[in-house]
Structure formats: structure tokens, C-alpha cells
């Protein structure tokens, strides 16, 4: 199991936090889980509405509301029922199950960063994610083929018509 998951599960246990449905890891911890960058000190989770209602009832003075996104802030945790009013069920699509947690899918994480790209930190995350996608998902054979024509692309402004490469 991932060190990120171990760390989050340990902190949840130490704080006596338990949920009916698996919490969804988002934000910096998800970025670290995928190996894109180190997370900050906070741990962001999205939980089901039912779990949120129980948590909010237990910790009424720890509730937080950001433009209708309701959450509870406990220690290093920010635990939300939605992000940009996108709820647990929406963010759950293609999530990765790890122990007692779920990790938001790469595609949903990317979408969340796009939604917040006016914030400089998230704009940097988008650039990091773009490089991650290129490194992990580009067709390596196509990339090698394209690299043989780099000189032609430079001379032609990036586009070569009719297979007329000018590589020499």
C-alpha cells in the first residue's frame, strides 16, 4: 500500500475519524499518491452527504462553508461534502480503492484543477499534470517516430504536408 494512504489512514485513526463510506482523497495528497509532487501539511477529503451530516452534527463549531461547499475542519483534515458543488458521487467515478480510502481518479483530479486554475498554485498543478500525462500516456513509438523529424517540424512551423520532410 502507498505511503500516502498509510499516512492518511494513520491520521484518521489517531483522530478517531470513521465513515460509513470510504472517504475520497483529493488535492495535494492525491497529487503525491500519483507521484506528481509532494503534498502540503493538510489532508483534503470528500465524503458522502450522510457522512458529512454525521460529522457536522458531532463537530458543529468546526464547520466551514465556502460558497455552498460545506466541510468540517479537524486538525490537519479538511473534509468536504463537495468541491465547487461537485459531490462525492460525481468525484467517485474511476476512483482508486486503497485500503479504507479512495483516491480521486486522474481525470477527476485534472478536472478539479481546471475548475480552480485561476489560483496560481493550481495552475502550476495543471502544468505538472500535463507533463505527468505526457510521460505516462504518450505513445512511445509515435514519439520516437516524431523525434526523427524534429528538424522538419522546426523548418515547417510544426506541420509537414504530403510527407515532404526536410530532415537534412
Language-model segments: which ranges?
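Compositionally biased terminal segments of proteins
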Residues: 1-168
Amino acid at each position: 500500500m502507498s505511503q500516502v494512504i498509510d499516512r492518511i489512514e494513520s491520521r484518521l485513526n489517531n483522530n478517531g475519524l470513521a465513515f460509513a463510506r470510504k472517504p475520497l482523497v483529493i488535492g495535494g495528497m492525491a497529487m503525491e499518491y500519483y507521484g506528481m509532487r509532494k503534498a502540503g501539511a493538510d489532508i483534503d477529503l470528500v465524503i458522502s452527504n450522510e457522512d458529512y451530516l454525521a460529522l457536522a452534527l458531532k463537530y458543529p463549531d468546526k464547520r466551514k462553508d465556502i460558497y455552498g461547499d460545506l466541510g468540517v475542519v479537524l486538525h490537519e483534515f479538511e473534509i468536504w461534502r463537495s468541491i465547487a458543488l461537485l459531490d462525492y458521487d460525481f468525484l467517485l467515478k474511476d476512483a482508486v480503492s486503497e485500503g479504507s480510502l479512495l483516491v480521486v481518479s486522474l481525470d477527476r483530479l485534472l478536472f478539479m484543477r481546471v475548475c480552480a486554475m485561476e489560483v496560481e498554485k493550481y495552475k502550476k498543478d495543471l502544468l505538472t499534470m500535463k507533463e505527468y500525462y505526457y510521460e505516462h500516456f504518450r505513445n512511445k513509438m509515435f514519439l520516437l517516430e516524431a523525434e526523427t523529424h524534429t528538424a522538419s517540424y522546426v523548418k515547417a512551423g510544426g506541420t509537414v504536408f504530403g510527407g515532404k520532410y526536410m530532415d537534412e
